[in-house]
């Protein structure tokens, strides 16, 4: 019945402000550990760098991907040939980066006998890779797999939608798929009353939380140092080692944010300061069937309890998490109050703030280490990065707990996954 109510809510559409998504209560208590559980063994990511001007501006995505693939296997001392499959999320490379990702595999000394695929569900591609590998484990295709995400927004063509029929003009929703993301942010702000001040307040909080987390070293366990080469304007090359996220601005103030001009619309409220940053980065996550992880003596960082993806109107795609999270919680038998951390991608402060309000999430539970406004949003990488950040933060806290990863998706979707940290 609850699932039906959620689906009916989708059909009524977001304009129905009277609808409040609710997850079904947990009737049987916390899930019991099962040998068939899909568990997260380990995950690492690169630092996230500013596209076009940061430490990875001249680094190809296969190199970024290889760095995290190699680190994850080395950290847990797993032989590469023990992998049953690899899935890589990517948005901007041709063919979702299928050739690039296979090259990264070989750069990481993972043998050709290990298969690989790539997936593009836009901003949720990294999380979709996790879901794809989890599906293979659940259906018995293999016991261990690697889910990754990578994006070089420095080196990719971001403005080409590909070969599209002129008939799209005949269908409103088809046309809406080509609306610039910044305009969808403005649509959310206008239709749901998310003011410029509210967006800037959200953005400031993201920067402050990320700066505090970085100063405390909270990201160190996640980040793989990457030594690479950068070229200056004169063509001079130099070697650098990138060890920390570049987009965090500790000196951000409300006054500074208020001075920024609208980025997408003359009288708009979405600015460079309250939007996610264009970024480069990669992440890799090792998943396994619990029984296999225990057999090999591998650590268990978390358990994937549910995954959901839903559709929403393309012109307000940013509302996706507000519709995906209730479905994922319902699948896991949980409510909002059962969750300690919500990692919601901050594509834009407008849509993130809307989702927090719509779901009535306690602000202190949302992105406690900051989000994409401060850290950046390398499209294919983000979902995997969020999983790693979430589970490492739950590990720092120590107790058994649940966390949610969610994001909006261009062309009108939302994805969400529920993870359990088993406790120290």
Curated annotation (Swiss-Prot):
PANTHER family associated with the record: 3-KETOACYL-COA THIOLASE, PEROXISOMAL
CDD domains on file: thiolase
Subunit structure, interactors included: Homodimer. Interacts (via PTS2-type peroxisomal targeting signal region) with PEX7; leading to its translocation into peroxisomes.
A Pfam family the protein falls into: Thiolase_C
Protein known as: 3-ketoacyl-CoA thiolase, peroxisomal
Record InterPro entries: Thiolase (IPR002155), Thiolase-like (IPR016039), Thiolase-like_sf_Thiolase (IPR050215), Thiolase_acyl_enz_int_AS (IPR020615), Thiolase_AS (IPR020610), Thiolase_C (IPR020617), Thiolase_CS (IPR020613), Thiolase_N (IPR020616)
UniProt similarity note: Belongs to the thiolase-like superfamily. Thiolase family.
Keywords, ordered alphabetically: Acyltransferase, Fatty acid metabolism, Lipid metabolism, Peroxisome, Phosphoprotein, Transferase, Transit peptide
Top EC class for this record: transferase
Keyword Cytoplasm recorded: no
Comment on protein domains: The PTS2-type peroxisomal targeting signal, which mediates interaction with PEX7 and localization to peroxisomes, is cleaved following import into peroxisomes.
